């Protein structure tokens, strides 16, 4: 199984995943995990990924452009690594980690385990520009009725 994690903190994700049993599964090639740094896809020289919400409101959102470009890069990686022709099959599932999502449980874990690949989208700030969520996300998932600083820990929980 292949996991692609779109994140602002790739080192945090990979250090967590390379520990314990998950780390052994990665080193033996049983699973593959790639953390993709969304900042690598920003057009801003300062690598900023946040902006004010369109129409106003409190807080900052992750911008659509770097998130979408990171997603497109992962699709490109998947074509190369997995040798899949995505024109003739359904697109991979993209799991957006959000406290507003469906609660992750054993039934969902078994369902997702049947996928060849999963892309996890880890948000920060007040969330991600809704336009990119509407375009690429297939599943909105929460690991519980509480708020965390980002989606990295929930993604690691689900991968584990």
Label every PLM stretch briefly.
Residues 128, 132-160:
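Structured adenosyl-cofactor binding patch, chiefly the S-adenosyl-L-methionine
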Residues 1-82, 86:
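N-terminal nucleotide/polyanion-binding subdomain common to many enzyme families
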């Amino acid at each position: 199984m292949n996991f692609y994690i779109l994140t602002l903190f790739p080192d945090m994700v990979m250090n967590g995943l390379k520990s314990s049993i998950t780390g052994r599964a990665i080193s033996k090639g049983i699973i593959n995990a790639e953390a993709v740094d969304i900042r690598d896809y920003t057009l801003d020289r300062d690598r900023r990924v946040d902006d004010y919400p369109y129409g106003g409101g409190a807080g900052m959102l992750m911008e659509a452009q770097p998130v979408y470009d990171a997603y497109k890069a992962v699709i490109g990686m998947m074509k190369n690594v997995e040798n899949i022709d995505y024109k003739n099959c359904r697109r991979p599932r993209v799991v957006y980690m959000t406290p507003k999502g469906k609660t992750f449980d054993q039934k969902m874990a078994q369902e997702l385990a049947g996928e060849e690949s999963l892309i996890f989208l880890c948000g920060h700030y007040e969330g991600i520009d809704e336009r990119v969520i509407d375009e690429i996300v297939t599943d909105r998932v929460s690991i519980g009725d509480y708020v965390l600083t980002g989606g990295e820990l929930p993604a690691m929980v689900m991968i584990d």
